[in-house]
């Protein structure tokens, strides 16, 4: 019988530290609901003491989820722990995650503390946290660069103070397979407790070994894996949870351990994070990449046609990738469209379906057939427009002279107020973005601009992702349309709208 490996998802906390990623309040809540549907055991929803926005989103997630444990991060500071308590007290299973750095380089250059000071802080703050929480998780930050004897002392101190989950972070992705496994073996053999202690692994991918090291931790005695969807995170990212889960599933003969994830929700979860983070999943990404189940070589194609297992160790259906798609067309009616939404896993009320059906018919008039990816794109675009404080109403472009273009942009806010401005630029995109900047009265820097086609062919819808720097803060925007310029404008307006929402601003103020 396989042992259970808990999955601790930190997409909303560590994943959001990815440069350029800044989830909105609504996006955080939608992500948390999908993670619960996927079946993760614990969601690290944020760092409540870091900002009012983080506190409110953690609180909302705690009040919304029904089965998943909701965790908040806290430094060894009582005010941090209090903030986590207030944010998560309504959760079905509240958890606090207390951490302090333990490596020599952190003690000397960051904390300016001695080892004795660190041990005293661990004892004081884990003891305090245990008074408020049934479950306290402790992490010695930069554990893999901490001398092993001192690491054992830190963990023993935390356990004696009441911690029942011990997380060992490879904070800078420094460790390797055997070394990381040895740390867990040493801790499980050396640390004593009358309570059951769950050891957890948290790996970064700086040397490309986050998933490998996570699996090594299981071999060393870990029973929980921390990571993010698609492996997003600061620098090179975190362990990709979907890769860990499928490795355990496919190689159960070796690991003898399984997660409780609903694997059929894997692709949908990956797509959601990709969309909200504005980070396209690489085509060759394991498990969820577009090429994961593609075969170009003639020999490989021949083998797969004869027997799929000749070159595939898992089926697309296992992770929720459909291979029996029945596209819709311009003659498809509301009933067929509604059935398609259910088949794709969407639970959308009838009123919302009316607007989605109108968008579907508009696309069907332009395309021979509407694929599942088109349907997903329609819903994605609708979600973004529904959340936005401002949305694009009309866009007019005109060629002026000498390569200059003129753009007139009209946007509308949720109260129905109309805002309009115009500008010129060396090309359509520059003109459009200058006009939008004039409407919002903000100077911006365009950090990233990417166009992706939703499907193949010249009639494909275009997805545009932008990343802007506004007043020192990065925000991303997403737009989708058959017209690339319309999609580009929608994405730019959404990025501005996100900044305005988070800074409680109105256009023209």
Swiss-Prot record:
Its cofactor is Mn(2+). It catalyses: 3-methyl-2-oxobutanoate + acetyl-CoA + H2O = (2S)-2-isopropylmalate + CoA + H(+). GO terms for molecular function: 2-isopropylmalate synthase activity; acetyl-CoA C-acetyltransferase activity; manganese ion binding. InterPro entries: 2-IPM_HCS-like, 2-isopropylmalate_synth_dimer, Aldolase_TIM, LeuA/HCS_post-cat, LeuA_allosteric_dom_sf, LeuA_bact_synth, PYR_CT. This is 2-isopropylmalate synthase. NCBIfam families: leuA_bact, PRK00915.1-3, PRK00915.1-5. It is an enzyme of class 2 (transferase). It comes from the Bacteria. Gene3D superfamilies: 1.10.238.260, 3.30.160.270, Aldolase class I. Catalyzes the condensation of the acetyl group of acetyl-CoA with 3-methyl-2-oxobutanoate (2-ketoisovalerate) to form 3-carboxy-3-hydroxy-4-methylpentanoate (2-isopropylmalate). Homodimer. Pfam families: HCS_D2, HMGL-like, LeuA_dimer. The gene is leuA.
């Amino acid at each position: 019988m396989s042992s259970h490996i808990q999955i601790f998802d930190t997409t909303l906390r560590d994943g959001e530290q990815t440069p350029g990623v800044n989830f909105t309040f609504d996006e955080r809540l939608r992500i948390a609901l999908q993670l619960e549907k996927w079946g993760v055991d614990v969601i690290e929803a944020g760092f409540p003491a870091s900002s009012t926005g983080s506190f409110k989103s953690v609180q909302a997630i705690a009040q919304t989820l029904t089965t998943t444990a909701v965790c908040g991060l806290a430094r060894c500071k009582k005010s941090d722990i209090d903030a986590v308590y207030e944010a998560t007290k309504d959760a079905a299973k509240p958890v606090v995650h207390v951490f302090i750095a333990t490596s020599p380089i952190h003690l000397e250059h960051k904390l300016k503390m001695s080892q004795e000071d660190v041990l005293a802080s661990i004892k004081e703050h884990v003891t305090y946290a245990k008074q408020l929480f049934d479950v306290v998780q402790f992490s010695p930050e930069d554990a893999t660069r901490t001398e092993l004897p001192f690491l054992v002392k830190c963990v023993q101190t935390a356990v004696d103070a009441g911690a029942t989950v011990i997380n060992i972070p490879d904070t800078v992705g420094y460790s390797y397979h055997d070394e990381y496994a040895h740390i867990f073996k040493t801790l499980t053999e050396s640390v004593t407790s009358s309570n059951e202690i769950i050891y957890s692994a948290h790996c970064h991918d700086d040397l490309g070994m986050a998933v490998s090291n996570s699996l090594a931790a299981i071999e060393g005695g870990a029973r929980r894996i921390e990571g993010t969807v698609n492996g997003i995170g600061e620098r090179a990212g975190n362990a990709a949870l979907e890769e860990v889960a499928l490795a355990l599933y496919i190689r159960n003969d070796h690991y003898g351990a399984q997660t409780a994830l609903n694997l059929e929700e894997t692709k949908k979860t990956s797509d959601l994070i990709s969309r909200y983070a504005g980070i396209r999943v690489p085509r060759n990404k394991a498990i969820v990449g577009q090429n994961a189940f593609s075969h170009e070589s003639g020999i490989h194609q021949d083998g797969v046609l004869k027997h799929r297992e000749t070159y595939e160790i898992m089926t697309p259906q296992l992770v929720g990738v459909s291979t029996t798609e029945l596209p819709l067309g311009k003659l498809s009616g509301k009933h067929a469209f509604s059935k398609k939404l259910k088949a794709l896993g969407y639970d959308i009320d009838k009123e919302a379906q009316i607007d989605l059906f109108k968008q579907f018919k508009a696309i069907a008039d332009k395309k021979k057939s509407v694929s599942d990816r088109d349907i997903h794109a329609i819903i994605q675009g609708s979600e973004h427009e529904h959340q936005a404080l401002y949305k694009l109403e009309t866009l007019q472009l005109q060629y002026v002279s000498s390569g200059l273009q003129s753009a007139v942009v009209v946007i509308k806010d949720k109260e129905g107020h109309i805002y309009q401005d115009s500008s010129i630029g060396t090309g359509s995109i520059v003109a459009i973005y200058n006009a939008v900047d004039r409407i919002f009265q903000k100077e911006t820097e365009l950090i990233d601009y990417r166009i992706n086609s939703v499907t193949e062919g010249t009639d494909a819808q275009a997805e545009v992702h932008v990343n802007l720097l506004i007043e020192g803060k990065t925000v991303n925007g997403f737009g989708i349309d058959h017209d690339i310029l319309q999609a580009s404008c929608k994405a730019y307006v959404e990025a501005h709208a996100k900044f305005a929402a988070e800074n409680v601003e109105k256009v023209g103020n």
